Design a protein with these regions (language model features):
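A compositional/biophysical signature of low hydrophobicity enriched in polar/charged and small residues
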Residues: 1-331
Length: 331
């Protein structure tokens, strides 16, 4: 499906799962004004083709703790090998191959020992690596789990929003951790499927999930190729912002509908933003019309050629094609 654009209903279904990845088909159907059978059939097709996958994400604070943004320059012809080696690591949830074929961008979440071994020993000892830089995440303004594609009306989004956390995160036992691990693979698994996977009664699983949700630990992320939503360009923007304006600029960008990540970082650039655009002209307009008035000192634009892994999910993508046709599917 990578050479096609999703139709209106499929885009709305993706947006619904961006709001609540565990929303029941009946609830989605009521909000969108279609039948539950249609929702079930459409979602099954999207998931079967790999166009859509929903996973559990750690809390923003948990994800940011100790996170590094890696930029790895490699010899030409070696970018695939390095990208897939990084993607094979469970502590590296995001991996992109950048345009030009000599840079891999990745996010690493790990304890200091594992992180330092990769940055200080493994990458420098790899013959195909020319240079590697690591930038610590200092603050998260927004991340991929909060991005909304924007095809739902405000009242539809509000109707799908899950209940906010009502308790502090609970202490986790082995069963909790196993449930969260299962949801990290597929956040839409039914209570019955989860019960079978962890070897616990379904009633116990329901109670545990309710407890985890109340503690804010069931945050989900709908992974979808943005090209299927008509966004053919994905770019990392490394920004140099005057320190006195860093918070203001970060918050402004975090509220922009095309931005799917904004992080304050260490290194030469103190802010990194990730942005989806319909095309290169759209990226130019974003740079001139959105970034231009913000008083940013310098912008380095790195365009993603191919996403290899997103939110812990390996992708089967290929370079963005020149054109696509809408998917026509009956309701």
């Amino acid at each position: 499906m990578a050479d096609q654009v999703l139709d209106e209903l499929d885009r709305s279904l993706v947006c619904a799962l961006q709001v609540d990845g565990r929303a029941e088909p009946g609830r989605i159907a009521e909000v969108l004004g279609v039948s539950a059978r249609t929702v079930t059939r459409r979602l099954a097709r999207l998931q079967h083709t790999g166009a859509l996958r929903v996973v559990r994400l750690p809390a923003v604070e948990e994800a940011a703790l100790g996170a590094l943004l890696l930029r790895v320059r490699v010899l030409r012809g070696k970018v695939e090998a390095i990208a897939h080696a990084l993607a094979a690591r469970p502590d590296v949830p995001f991996v992109d191959i950048m345009l030009g074929g000599h840079e891999v961008s990745a996010v690493m979440l790990a304890d200091p020992g594992s992180r330092d071994h990769l940055v200080h020993a493994q990458l420098p000892a790899t013959g195909s690596v020319v240079e590697a830089s690591a930038h610590a995440v200092l603050h998260v303004f927004t991340d991929a789990g909060r991005w909304r594609a924007g095809y739902l009306a405000a009242d539809q989004t509000a109707a799908l929003e899950p209940e906010p956390p009502t308790t502090p995160p609970p202490a986790l036992d082995e069963l909790d951790r196993r449930l969260l691990a299962e949801l990290g693979e597929d956040a839409r698994r039914s209570h019955a499927a989860l019960a079978a996977a962890v070897g616990a009664p379904e009633s116990t699983v329901r109670r545990r999930l309710a407890r985890l949700a109340a503690g804010g630990l069931l945050r989900t992320h709908a992974t979808v190729d943005a090209r299927l939503l008509g966004m053919t360009v994905d770019a990392n923007l490394w920004l140099d912002v005057p320190p006195g304006r860093l918070a203001e600029v970060g918050e402004r960008l975090a509220g922009h509908p095309q931005v799917h990540g904004v992080l304050a970082t260490s290194g030469p650039a103190n802010l990194m933003a990730t942005v989806f655009c319909p095309d290169h002209a759209g990226l130019y307009r974003f740079t001139t019309e959105t970034l231009g008035p913000l008083g940013i000192s310098r912008v380095e634009t790195a365009i993603v050629a191919r996403a290899v892994k997103r939110a812990g999910v390996p992708l089967r993508g290929e370079p963005a094609p020149g054109g696509r046709r809408p998917v026509r599917a009956s309701r």
